[in-house]
Protein backbone atom coordinates (compact mmCIF):
# COMPACT_ATOMS: atom_id res chain seq x y z
CA UNK A 1 0.00 0.00 0.00
CA UNK A 2 3.04 2.27 0.02
CA UNK A 3 3.80 4.63 -2.86
CA UNK A 4 7.39 4.75 -4.20
CA UNK A 5 9.03 8.12 -3.64
CA UNK A 6 11.65 9.22 -6.17
CA UNK A 7 14.10 12.04 -5.59
CA UNK A 8 15.17 11.19 -2.04
CA UNK A 9 18.92 11.25 -1.42
CA UNK A 10 20.36 8.75 1.04
CA UNK A 11 23.85 8.82 2.53
CA UNK A 12 25.46 5.68 3.95
CA UNK A 13 28.46 5.88 6.31
CA UNK A 14 30.23 2.97 7.99
CA UNK A 15 30.78 3.04 11.74
CA UNK A 16 34.49 2.38 12.17
CA UNK A 17 35.82 0.39 15.09
CA UNK A 18 33.11 -2.28 15.02
CA UNK A 19 34.18 -5.59 13.46
CA UNK A 20 31.15 -7.70 12.60
CA UNK A 21 33.31 -10.68 11.75
CA UNK A 22 33.64 -11.25 15.51
CA UNK A 23 31.15 -11.94 18.28
CA UNK A 24 32.48 -8.99 20.26
CA UNK A 25 31.81 -6.78 17.28
CA UNK A 26 28.18 -7.84 17.25
CA UNK A 27 27.98 -7.19 20.97
CA UNK A 28 29.41 -3.69 20.45
CA UNK A 29 26.91 -3.06 17.66
CA UNK A 30 24.08 -4.07 19.96
CA UNK A 31 25.35 -1.75 22.69
CA UNK A 32 25.65 1.16 20.25
CA UNK A 33 22.13 0.55 19.01
CA UNK A 34 20.93 0.96 22.58
CA UNK A 35 22.44 4.45 22.94
CA UNK A 36 21.93 5.59 19.35
CA UNK A 37 19.90 8.81 19.13
CA UNK A 38 18.19 9.49 15.80
CA UNK A 39 17.92 13.16 16.75
CA UNK A 40 21.74 13.34 17.07
CA UNK A 41 23.14 10.41 15.12
CA UNK A 42 26.71 11.65 14.77
CA UNK A 43 26.92 12.79 18.37
CA UNK A 44 25.56 9.57 19.81
CA UNK A 45 28.00 7.48 17.74
CA UNK A 46 31.10 9.54 18.49
CA UNK A 47 29.99 9.84 22.10
CA UNK A 48 30.12 6.06 22.34
CA UNK A 49 33.74 6.10 21.19
CA UNK A 50 33.33 5.35 17.49
CA UNK A 51 33.90 7.33 14.31
CA UNK A 52 32.20 7.51 10.94
CA UNK A 53 33.89 6.89 7.62
CA UNK A 54 33.34 9.02 4.54
CA UNK A 55 29.93 8.40 3.07
CA UNK A 56 28.48 7.58 -0.29
CA UNK A 57 25.16 8.94 -1.56
CA UNK A 58 22.47 7.84 -3.98
CA UNK A 59 19.09 9.26 -5.04
CA UNK A 60 16.01 7.05 -5.28
CA UNK A 61 14.79 6.34 -8.79
CA UNK A 62 11.25 6.30 -10.17
CA UNK A 63 10.63 3.06 -8.30
CA UNK A 64 11.75 4.69 -5.05
CA UNK A 65 14.90 2.54 -4.89
CA UNK A 66 18.55 3.34 -4.19
CA UNK A 67 20.97 0.39 -4.29
CA UNK A 68 24.33 0.64 -2.53
CA UNK A 69 26.50 -2.19 -3.83
CA UNK A 70 29.89 -3.52 -2.83
CA UNK A 71 29.62 -2.49 0.82
CA UNK A 72 32.08 -4.29 3.11
CA UNK A 73 30.79 -6.15 6.15
CA UNK A 74 30.05 -3.63 8.88
CA UNK A 75 27.59 -1.40 10.71
CA UNK A 76 26.26 1.58 8.76
CA UNK A 77 24.49 4.83 9.53
CA UNK A 78 21.79 5.58 6.93
CA UNK A 79 20.42 9.11 6.62
CA UNK A 80 18.22 11.05 4.23
CA UNK A 81 20.18 14.11 3.19
CA UNK A 82 17.79 15.58 0.61
CA UNK A 83 14.13 15.07 -0.16
CA UNK A 84 11.32 16.78 -2.11
CA UNK A 85 9.36 19.71 -0.72
CA UNK A 86 6.52 18.72 1.58
CA UNK A 87 8.19 15.47 2.61
CA UNK A 88 9.01 14.56 6.20
CA UNK A 89 12.08 12.29 6.08
CA UNK A 90 12.40 9.02 7.91
CA UNK A 91 14.65 9.16 10.95
CA UNK A 92 18.33 8.15 10.61
CA UNK A 93 18.94 4.51 11.48
CA UNK A 94 21.68 1.89 11.85
CA UNK A 95 21.79 -1.21 9.68
CA UNK A 96 24.28 -4.06 9.57
CA UNK A 97 25.66 -5.89 6.56
CA UNK A 98 25.01 -8.79 6.76
CA UNK A 99 21.71 -9.34 8.57
CA UNK A 100 20.46 -12.55 10.10
CA UNK A 101 17.91 -14.15 7.80
CA UNK A 102 14.57 -13.83 9.63
CA UNK A 103 13.28 -16.96 7.89
CA UNK A 104 16.41 -19.01 8.53
CA UNK A 105 18.25 -18.01 11.68
CA UNK A 106 21.27 -20.07 10.63
CA UNK A 107 21.78 -18.00 7.50
CA UNK A 108 23.16 -14.53 6.72
CA UNK A 109 21.61 -12.04 4.30
CA UNK A 110 24.22 -10.02 2.45
CA UNK A 111 21.66 -8.47 0.12
CA UNK A 112 19.98 -6.21 2.66
CA UNK A 113 16.72 -4.42 1.87
CA UNK A 114 15.41 -1.66 4.11
CA UNK A 115 12.18 0.28 3.68
CA UNK A 116 12.33 3.71 5.31
CA UNK A 117 8.94 5.40 5.23
CA UNK A 118 8.63 9.07 4.41
CA UNK A 119 5.58 11.14 5.20
CA UNK A 120 4.29 13.21 2.29
CA UNK A 121 2.21 16.21 3.31
CA UNK A 122 -0.17 17.39 0.61
CA UNK A 123 -2.36 20.47 0.92
CA UNK A 124 -5.14 22.20 -0.98
CA UNK A 125 -6.57 25.69 -0.94
CA UNK A 126 -9.99 27.00 -1.95
CA UNK A 127 -11.63 30.42 -2.07
CA UNK A 128 -15.25 31.29 -1.29
CA UNK A 129 -16.40 34.59 -2.81
CA UNK A 130 -19.70 33.73 -4.52
CA UNK A 131 -21.62 35.83 -1.98
CA UNK A 132 -19.27 38.79 -2.32
CA UNK A 133 -20.32 41.64 -4.62
CA UNK A 134 -18.62 44.88 -3.64
CA UNK A 135 -15.35 45.98 -2.06
CA UNK A 136 -15.54 45.39 1.67
CA UNK A 137 -17.46 42.13 1.34
CA UNK A 138 -15.91 39.05 2.96
CA UNK A 139 -13.87 36.54 0.98
CA UNK A 140 -12.76 33.35 2.75
CA UNK A 141 -9.82 31.07 2.02
CA UNK A 142 -9.65 27.48 3.26
CA UNK A 143 -6.38 25.54 3.56
CA UNK A 144 -6.68 21.79 4.08
CA UNK A 145 -3.50 19.90 4.91
CA UNK A 146 -2.54 16.33 5.57
CA UNK A 147 -0.78 15.55 8.83
CA UNK A 148 2.71 14.02 8.62
CA UNK A 149 2.76 10.29 9.34
CA UNK A 150 5.51 10.75 11.89
CA UNK A 151 5.80 10.45 15.64
CA UNK A 152 6.97 12.66 17.11
CA UNK A 153 6.15 15.59 14.86
CA UNK A 154 8.91 18.09 15.65
CA UNK A 155 7.29 21.06 13.92
CA UNK A 156 4.18 21.95 11.95
CA UNK A 157 2.95 25.31 10.72
CA UNK A 158 0.88 26.84 7.94
CA UNK A 159 1.65 30.28 6.51
CA UNK A 160 -0.62 32.29 4.22
CA UNK A 161 0.91 35.53 2.93
CA UNK A 162 -2.15 37.52 1.93
CA UNK A 163 -2.09 39.91 -1.01
CA UNK A 164 -2.06 43.62 -0.04
CA UNK A 165 -5.49 43.92 -1.70
CA UNK A 166 -6.87 41.71 1.08
CA UNK A 167 -7.53 42.87 4.64
CA UNK A 168 -7.26 40.17 7.31
CA UNK A 169 -10.36 39.72 9.48
CA UNK A 170 -10.05 36.44 11.39
CA UNK A 171 -8.89 32.81 11.24
CA UNK A 172 -10.05 29.52 12.71
CA UNK A 173 -8.28 26.15 12.97
CA UNK A 174 -9.98 22.76 13.24
CA UNK A 175 -9.31 19.09 12.60
CA UNK A 176 -11.51 17.58 9.91
CA UNK A 177 -12.62 14.66 12.09
CA UNK A 178 -13.82 16.96 14.87
CA UNK A 179 -11.00 16.25 17.32
CA UNK A 180 -10.89 19.20 19.71
CA UNK A 181 -7.94 21.57 19.59
CA UNK A 182 -7.65 24.87 21.42
CA UNK A 183 -6.04 28.12 20.36
CA UNK A 184 -3.24 29.16 22.68
CA UNK A 185 -2.80 25.65 24.04
CA UNK A 186 -2.47 23.54 20.91
CA UNK A 187 -1.74 26.19 18.29
CA UNK A 188 -1.25 29.92 17.82
CA UNK A 189 -2.55 32.30 15.15
CA UNK A 190 -0.44 35.36 14.34
CA UNK A 191 -1.19 38.03 11.74
CA UNK A 192 1.80 40.17 10.80
CA UNK A 193 0.42 43.56 9.79
CA UNK A 194 3.67 44.43 8.04
CA UNK A 195 3.74 41.46 5.67
CA UNK A 196 0.01 40.62 5.82
CA UNK A 197 1.00 37.00 6.54
CA UNK A 198 -1.13 34.72 8.70
CA UNK A 199 0.81 32.01 10.54
CA UNK A 200 -0.74 29.03 12.30
CA UNK A 201 1.85 27.14 14.32
CA UNK A 202 1.22 24.07 16.45
CA UNK A 203 2.70 23.81 19.92
CA UNK A 204 4.28 20.66 21.35
CA UNK A 205 0.91 19.74 22.86
CA UNK A 206 -0.82 20.35 19.55
CA UNK A 207 1.74 18.33 17.61
CA UNK A 208 1.16 15.41 19.95
CA UNK A 209 -2.53 15.58 19.07
CA UNK A 210 -1.64 15.67 15.38
CA UNK A 211 0.63 12.65 15.71
CA UNK A 212 -2.13 10.73 17.47
CA UNK A 213 -4.66 11.67 14.77
CA UNK A 214 -2.52 11.65 11.64
CA UNK A 215 -5.21 10.18 9.39
CA UNK A 216 -7.33 13.33 9.59
CA UNK A 217 -6.52 16.78 8.21
CA UNK A 218 -5.84 20.27 9.52
CA UNK A 219 -8.33 22.86 8.23
CA UNK A 220 -7.52 26.58 8.41
CA UNK A 221 -10.21 29.10 7.43
CA UNK A 222 -9.05 32.67 6.86
CA UNK A 223 -11.62 35.46 6.47
CA UNK A 224 -10.62 38.61 4.58
CA UNK A 225 -12.20 41.61 2.93
CA UNK A 226 -11.18 42.97 -0.47
CA UNK A 227 -9.90 46.56 -0.51
CA UNK A 228 -8.91 47.07 -4.17
CA UNK A 229 -9.67 45.78 -7.64
CA UNK A 230 -7.50 43.22 -9.37
CA UNK A 231 -7.10 39.53 -10.08
CA UNK A 232 -5.92 38.63 -6.60
CA UNK A 233 -3.90 35.40 -6.46
CA UNK A 234 -3.22 33.57 -3.24
CA UNK A 235 -1.50 30.38 -2.07
CA UNK A 236 -0.34 28.98 1.25
CA UNK A 237 2.71 27.13 2.56
CA UNK A 238 2.59 24.07 4.82
CA UNK A 239 5.76 23.34 6.80
CA UNK A 240 5.52 19.65 7.81
CA UNK A 241 8.57 19.46 10.08
CA UNK A 242 11.02 21.67 11.94
CA UNK A 243 13.74 21.32 9.30
CA UNK A 244 11.44 22.73 6.62
CA UNK A 245 11.04 26.01 8.54
CA UNK A 246 14.44 27.25 7.32
CA UNK A 247 14.15 26.12 3.69
CA UNK A 248 12.75 28.29 0.91
CA UNK A 249 9.59 27.20 -0.90
CA UNK A 250 10.38 25.02 -3.90
CA UNK A 251 13.69 23.86 -2.50
CA UNK A 252 14.25 20.20 -1.51
CA UNK A 253 13.01 19.61 2.00
CA UNK A 254 11.03 22.84 2.00
CA UNK A 255 7.34 23.47 2.61
CA UNK A 256 4.43 22.18 0.60
CA UNK A 257 2.96 24.88 -1.64
CA UNK A 258 -0.79 24.80 -2.19
CA UNK A 259 -2.29 25.36 -5.64
CA UNK A 260 -2.95 29.03 -6.36
CA UNK A 261 -6.50 30.39 -6.14
CA UNK A 262 -7.88 33.75 -7.26
CA UNK A 263 -10.63 36.20 -6.46
CA UNK A 264 -11.22 38.69 -9.28
CA UNK A 265 -12.49 42.26 -8.97
CA UNK A 266 -12.93 45.10 -11.43
CA UNK A 267 -15.36 47.62 -12.84
CA UNK A 268 -16.56 49.37 -15.98
CA UNK A 269 -16.54 52.81 -17.57
CA UNK A 270 -19.76 54.47 -18.73
CA UNK A 271 -19.93 57.29 -21.29
CA UNK A 272 -22.92 59.60 -20.90
CA UNK A 273 -23.97 61.33 -24.14
CA UNK A 274 -26.87 63.12 -25.76
CA UNK A 275 -28.54 62.03 -28.99
CA UNK A 276 -25.97 63.90 -31.01
CA UNK A 277 -23.09 62.23 -29.18
CA UNK A 278 -22.13 65.24 -27.07
CA UNK A 279 -20.83 64.41 -23.59
CA UNK A 280 -23.25 65.02 -20.73
CA UNK A 281 -22.58 65.58 -17.04
CA UNK A 282 -24.82 65.58 -14.00
CA UNK A 283 -26.36 62.14 -14.38
CA UNK A 284 -26.47 60.03 -11.21
CA UNK A 285 -26.51 56.23 -11.24
CA UNK A 286 -27.02 53.35 -8.83
CA UNK A 287 -25.95 49.72 -9.30
CA UNK A 288 -27.99 46.66 -8.32
CA UNK A 289 -27.46 42.91 -8.51
CA UNK A 290 -31.02 41.80 -9.31
CA UNK A 291 -33.76 42.95 -11.62
CA UNK A 292 -36.20 43.15 -8.71
CA UNK A 293 -33.92 45.41 -6.68
CA UNK A 294 -33.26 47.55 -9.73
CA UNK A 295 -36.99 48.01 -10.37
CA UNK A 296 -37.70 48.85 -6.73
CA UNK A 297 -34.41 50.72 -6.26
CA UNK A 298 -33.65 48.78 -3.08
CA UNK A 299 -30.36 47.30 -1.84
CA UNK A 300 -28.03 49.30 -4.09
CA UNK A 301 -24.34 48.45 -4.25
CA UNK A 302 -22.21 50.50 -1.85
CA UNK A 303 -18.67 51.48 -2.86
CA UNK A 304 -16.50 53.56 -0.56
CA UNK A 305 -19.61 54.45 1.41
CA UNK A 306 -21.50 55.73 -1.64
CA UNK A 307 -24.63 54.26 -3.22
CA UNK A 308 -24.92 56.93 -5.92
CA UNK A 309 -22.34 57.69 -8.59
CA UNK A 310 -22.44 61.01 -10.45
CA UNK A 311 -21.00 61.83 -13.85
CA UNK A 312 -18.75 64.83 -13.18
CA UNK A 313 -16.05 64.42 -15.82
CA UNK A 314 -16.30 66.90 -18.67
CA UNK A 315 -15.97 64.07 -21.17
CA UNK A 316 -19.09 62.43 -19.72
CA UNK A 317 -17.31 59.33 -18.46
CA UNK A 318 -17.92 57.59 -15.16
CA UNK A 319 -15.83 54.67 -13.90
CA UNK A 320 -17.46 52.41 -11.32
CA UNK A 321 -14.83 50.19 -9.67
CA UNK A 322 -14.98 47.61 -6.92
CA UNK A 323 -17.31 44.91 -8.24
CA UNK A 324 -16.60 41.18 -8.40
CA UNK A 325 -16.19 39.73 -11.87
CA UNK A 326 -19.50 38.45 -13.18
CA UNK A 327 -17.97 35.36 -14.77
CA UNK A 328 -15.62 34.16 -12.02
CA UNK A 329 -16.65 32.84 -8.59
CA UNK A 330 -15.15 30.53 -5.98
CA UNK A 331 -11.94 30.31 -7.97
CA UNK A 332 -13.46 29.15 -11.25
CA UNK A 333 -15.12 30.45 -14.40
CA UNK A 334 -18.93 30.59 -14.25
CA UNK A 335 -21.55 31.20 -16.92
CA UNK A 336 -25.03 32.77 -16.83
CA UNK A 337 -27.28 30.53 -14.79
CA UNK A 338 -24.43 29.11 -12.72
CA UNK A 339 -24.25 29.69 -8.99
CA UNK A 340 -22.14 32.74 -8.30
CA UNK A 341 -22.66 34.39 -11.69
CA UNK A 342 -23.33 38.12 -11.25
CA UNK A 343 -25.60 40.15 -13.50
CA UNK A 344 -25.44 43.85 -12.67
CA UNK A 345 -28.05 46.54 -13.36
CA UNK A 346 -27.35 50.22 -13.90
CA UNK A 347 -30.20 52.55 -12.93
CA UNK A 348 -30.23 56.27 -13.65
CA UNK A 349 -31.75 58.05 -10.65
CA UNK A 350 -31.03 61.57 -11.88
CA UNK A 351 -30.84 62.66 -15.51
CA UNK A 352 -28.66 65.47 -16.82
CA UNK A 353 -30.38 68.83 -16.73
CA UNK A 354 -32.79 69.17 -19.65
CA UNK A 355 -32.88 65.45 -20.42
CA UNK A 356 -35.29 62.64 -19.76
CA UNK A 357 -34.53 59.98 -17.15
CA UNK A 358 -33.77 56.54 -18.56
CA UNK A 359 -36.95 54.50 -18.59
CA UNK A 360 -35.43 51.12 -17.63
CA UNK A 361 -32.35 49.60 -15.97
CA UNK A 362 -29.40 48.70 -18.17
CA UNK A 363 -27.91 45.22 -17.71
CA UNK A 364 -24.13 44.92 -17.65
CA UNK A 365 -21.36 42.56 -16.57
CA UNK A 366 -17.93 43.08 -15.06
CA UNK A 367 -15.08 41.08 -16.59
CA UNK A 368 -11.41 41.38 -17.37
CA UNK A 369 -12.41 43.14 -20.59
CA UNK A 370 -14.57 45.78 -18.90
CA UNK A 371 -11.94 46.37 -16.25
CA UNK A 372 -9.34 47.24 -18.87
CA UNK A 373 -9.01 50.86 -19.97
CA UNK A 374 -11.67 52.15 -22.35
CA UNK A 375 -15.38 52.86 -22.55
CA UNK A 376 -17.52 49.77 -21.96
CA UNK A 377 -21.04 51.19 -22.04
CA UNK A 378 -22.44 54.27 -23.81
CA UNK A 379 -25.66 55.61 -22.28
CA UNK A 380 -27.68 58.05 -24.38
CA UNK A 381 -30.28 60.48 -23.02
CA UNK A 382 -32.95 62.31 -25.01
CA UNK A 383 -34.06 65.89 -24.33
CA UNK A 384 -37.23 66.52 -22.36
CA UNK A 385 -40.31 65.54 -24.43
CA UNK A 386 -38.25 64.82 -27.49
CA UNK A 387 -37.31 68.52 -27.80
CA UNK A 388 -40.90 69.87 -28.06
CA UNK A 389 -41.95 72.42 -25.43
CA UNK A 390 -45.25 71.41 -23.85
CA UNK A 391 -47.85 74.04 -22.82
CA UNK A 392 -47.41 75.92 -19.55
CA UNK A 393 -43.68 75.95 -20.06
CA UNK A 394 -43.54 79.17 -22.09
CA UNK A 395 -43.38 79.91 -25.81
CA UNK A 396 -45.82 80.23 -28.70
CA UNK A 397 -47.70 77.05 -27.96
CA UNK A 398 -48.96 78.46 -24.67
CA UNK A 399 -50.37 81.59 -26.29
CA UNK A 400 -52.24 79.52 -28.84
CA UNK A 401 -53.82 77.47 -26.10
CA UNK A 402 -54.86 80.51 -24.15
CA UNK A 403 -56.48 82.05 -27.26
CA UNK A 404 -58.24 78.80 -28.03
CA UNK A 405 -59.54 78.68 -24.49
CA UNK A 406 -60.89 82.21 -24.72
CA UNK A 407 -62.55 81.38 -27.97
CA UNK A 408 -64.27 78.39 -26.46
CA UNK A 409 -65.58 80.39 -23.57
CA UNK A 410 -66.78 83.16 -25.86
CA UNK A 411 -68.52 80.64 -28.05
CA UNK A 412 -70.20 79.26 -24.98
CA UNK A 413 -71.46 82.66 -23.99
CA UNK A 414 -72.85 83.34 -27.46
CA UNK A 415 -74.52 79.99 -27.45
CA UNK A 416 -76.24 80.70 -24.16
CA UNK A 417 -77.31 84.11 -25.20
CA UNK A 418 -78.76 82.86 -28.42
CA UNK A 419 -80.52 80.06 -26.64
CA UNK A 420 -82.02 82.38 -24.09
CA UNK A 421 -83.19 84.71 -26.77
CA UNK A 422 -84.88 81.86 -28.51
CA UNK A 423 -86.61 80.89 -25.28
CA UNK A 424 -87.69 84.42 -24.55
Where are these regions (language model features)?
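Solvent-exposed loop/turn and edge beta-strand elements of beta-rich ligand-binding domains
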Residues: 1-424
